């Protein structure tokens, strides 16, 4: 049996180890996407995709998510702010189509400092997702998205 002084010392040591935990234990906000959307859930009718948002500090709200549709239509660069809809699932938001049928488009979706680039095919379906990141200890750390990354992705998409 531990004596009270040993127990207090052990508890204090454990507390100090926890309090001094390295920053790499923390994780940044993260985004993942669901597409195609369940066609049998009538509340999601018209949704192109679902955004799953996660943070270490709790469940994100709709005000935490932002985005834009970035496109090239008839050779002209376009940017359209996106609005997201809450769903019945916490931290999951629906995105309905808000951009033109013509041209090549990608979606820039952000949750705080994490940004994803979602590419769309010629039919408007999700064809890829990229969260630009650096890596630390084998894990991705989201980094800011440069305008040139959006432009080069659109240039490649419009060539197809």
Where in the sequence are the language-model features?
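Bacterial N-terminal signal peptides that target proteins for export
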Residues: 1-11
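Bacterial N-terminal signal peptides
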Residues: 9-19
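N-terminal soluble domains immediately following signal/targeting peptides that reside
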Residues: 23-160
């Amino acid at each position: 049996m531990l004596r009270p002084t040993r127990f207090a010392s052990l508890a204090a040591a454990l507390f100090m180890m926890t309090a001094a935990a390295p920053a790499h234990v923390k994780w940044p906000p993260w985004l993942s996407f669901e597409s195609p959307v369940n066609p049998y859930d009538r509340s999601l009718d018209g949704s192109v995709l679902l955004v799953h948002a996660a943070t270490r500090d709790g469940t994100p709200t709709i005000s935490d998510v932002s985005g834009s549709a970035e496109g090239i239509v008839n050779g002209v660069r376009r940017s359209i702010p996106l609005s997201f809809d809450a769903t019945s699932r916490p931290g999951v938001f629906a995105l309905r189509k808000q951009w033109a049928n013509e041209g090549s488009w990608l979606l820039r979706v952000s949750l705080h400092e994490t940004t994803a680039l979602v590419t769309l095919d010629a039919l408007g379906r999700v064809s890829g997702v990229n969260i630009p990141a650096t890596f630390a200890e084998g894990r991705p750390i989201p980094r800011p998205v440069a305008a040139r990354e959006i432009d080069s992705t659109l240039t490649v998409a419009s060539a197809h």
